[in-house]
């Protein structure tokens, strides 16, 4: 079985029906200055049951492309956000 990539991030927007936008943070070492810097990227996640809210911390797993920009499915909700 193939390795499925997992990402963890915070829901920043309800992007539509069964779709949420998740902000993922990663830390990398700057090649010249050797300082740890934060890099951010937004992913569209498929949420079949519309169970997440803005501010929730979620885990998503890679799947087949569901649309032009959506290729991750919701796996679990780690923490609920404060609204």
Curated annotation (Swiss-Prot):
GO terms for cellular component: cytosolic small ribosomal subunit. The keyword Ribonucleoprotein applies. InterPro entries: NA-bd_OB-fold, Ribosomal_uS17, Ribosomal_uS17_bact/chlr, Ribosomal_uS17_CS. It holds the Pfam family Ribosomal_S17. Keywords: Ribonucleoprotein, Ribosomal protein, RNA-binding, rRNA-binding. Gene3D superfamilies: Nucleic acid-binding proteins (2.40.50.140). PROSITE patterns: RIBOSOMAL_S17. One of its GO terms (molecular function) is structural constituent of ribosome. One of its GO terms (biological process) is translation. Transmembrane segments: none annotated. The keyword rRNA-binding applies. Part of the 30S ribosomal subunit. One of the primary rRNA binding proteins, it binds specifically to the 5'-end of 16S ribosomal RNA. HAMAP family: Ribosomal_uS17_B. Belongs to the universal ribosomal protein uS17 family. This is Small ribosomal subunit protein uS17. It comes from Campylobacter jejuni subsp. doylei (strain ATCC BAA-1458 / RM4099 / 269.97).
């Amino acid at each position: 079985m193939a390795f499925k990539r997992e990402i963890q991030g915070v829901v920043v927007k309800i992007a539509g029906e069964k779709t949420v936008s998740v902000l993922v943070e990663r830390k990398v070492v700057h090649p010249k200055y050797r300082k740890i810097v934060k890099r951010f990227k937004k992913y569209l996640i498929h949420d079949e049951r519309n169970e997440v809210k803005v501010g929730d911390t979620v885990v998503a797993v890679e799947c087949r492309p569901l649309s032009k920009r959506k290729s991750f499915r919701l796996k679990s909700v780690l923490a609920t956000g404060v609204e």
